C-alpha cells in the first residue's frame, strides 16, 4: 500500500513539461523547449497539434555543420531558423506539415529554432539576427 501511495503522489510530476528557455531575438521574446539529446531532437514537435504563440523548440546539435530537418508526423506548419555557434540566424526556412522532404541549412549551424509558421516574418527577424538566452552563451 505505501508503494501505491508513493506512485500516486509522483504521477502528476511525470507528465510535467520541461523547463522553458526564455529567448530574445531583437525585441521579440520567445519561450522554447530545449532539445539537446539525440532522442529529444528526433522527437522534436512530432504529433503536436498546437504550439502556443511565442513558443518554440530549440535544437542543439553536437556538430557545427549543415543540418537538416523534416516534418514526418508533425502536423503543424512551422518555420525554422538555423543558428551558428554565436546564436546568429544563418538561414530561415518554412516547413510543410507531415512532409517527408528533407530541408537543410545553407550554412553550418549549431542550433535550429522551430516556431509557428510566419513567426519570424511577423517579428521582423531575418538572417543576421542574434538569439539571446541560449544556455552557455
Regions from the PLM with identified roles:
Residues 2-13:
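Bacterial N-terminal signal peptides
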Residues 17-137:
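Compact, glycine-rich, soluble single-domain proteins
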Amino acid at each position: 500500500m505505501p508503494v501505491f501511495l508513493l506512485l500516486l503522489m509522483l504521477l502528476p510530476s511525470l507528465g510535467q513539461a520541461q523547463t522553458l528557455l526564455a529567448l530574445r531575438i531583437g525585441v521579440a521574446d520567445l519561450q522554447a523547449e530545449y532539445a539537446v539529446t539525440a532522442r529529444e531532437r528526433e522527437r522534436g514537435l512530432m504529433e503536436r497539434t498546437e504550439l502556443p504563440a511565442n513558443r518554440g523548440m530549440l535544437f542543439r546539435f553536437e556538430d557545427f555543420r549543415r543540418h537538416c530537418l523534416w516534418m514526418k508526423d508533425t502536423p503543424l506548419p512551422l518555420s525554422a531558423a538555423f543558428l551558428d555557434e554565436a546564436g546568429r540566424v544563418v538561414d530561415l526556412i518554412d516547413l510543410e506539415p507531415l512532409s517527408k522532404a528533407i530541408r537543410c541549412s545553407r550554412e553550418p549551424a549549431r542550433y535550429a529554432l522551430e516556431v509557428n509558421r510566419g513567426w519570424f516574418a511577423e517579428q521582423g527577424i531575418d538572417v543576421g539576427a542574434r538569439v539571446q538566452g541560449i544556455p552557455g552563451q
